[in-house]
Amino acid sequence: MLTAKDIMTNKVISVTPDTSIEELSSILVKNEISGVPVVDDSGLLYGIVTENDLISQNKRLHIPTVVSFLDAAIYLESSKKFEQDVKRLTATKVKEICTRKVVTISEDISLVDIATLMAEKKVQLLPVVKAGKVIGIVGKRDMVKAVARQAE
């Protein structure tokens, strides 16, 4: 039976609570990932932040509405408002938008239990934690890869 330890990503990219949203966005894009754990100075799990947190309607942060047309960005709001939103966005810290109540797993949990947890809790990323520290992360992509490997 496969467990989280078998499929988790071991080299976890993380950020701190004081990481800027600008830096977070760059990390997510550069590494082609949808979210990262937030860890404090001692390496303990503080929270988790995802792309959804960046665009969530119920957060105080507002990303301007943009339409892409023929490779040009068209802002659906005034340019002055856009500039204000960008300034506010770059000044915002991860601690202001991250989820503090994080659903975590241990490395010995089965894939079936991981899938159930993801579905029930409606989460896409599960930090694998040992003694309060993140030792890995399991995302939906890891689950799909595991299923594909078993099918071969």
PLM feature spans:
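N-terminal short leaders/motifs
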Residues: 47-57, 61, 81-83
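Short hydrophobic beta-strand motif reused across regulatory alpha/beta modules
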Residues: 47-50, 137-143
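A short, polar/charged loop-to-alpha-helix boundary motif
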Residues: 55-70, 144-152
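Gly/Ser-rich helix-loop-strand patches that form or flank binding pockets
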Residues: 121, 125, 139-151
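Bateman/CBS regulatory modules and CBS-like beta-alpha motifs in cytosolic regions of diverse proteins
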Residues: 1-27, 33, 38-41, 45-46, ...
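Generic detector of well-ordered alpha-helical packing
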Residues: 41, 52-54, 143
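Short, basic and Ser/Thr-rich N-terminal targeting/leader segments
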Residues: 31-32, 122
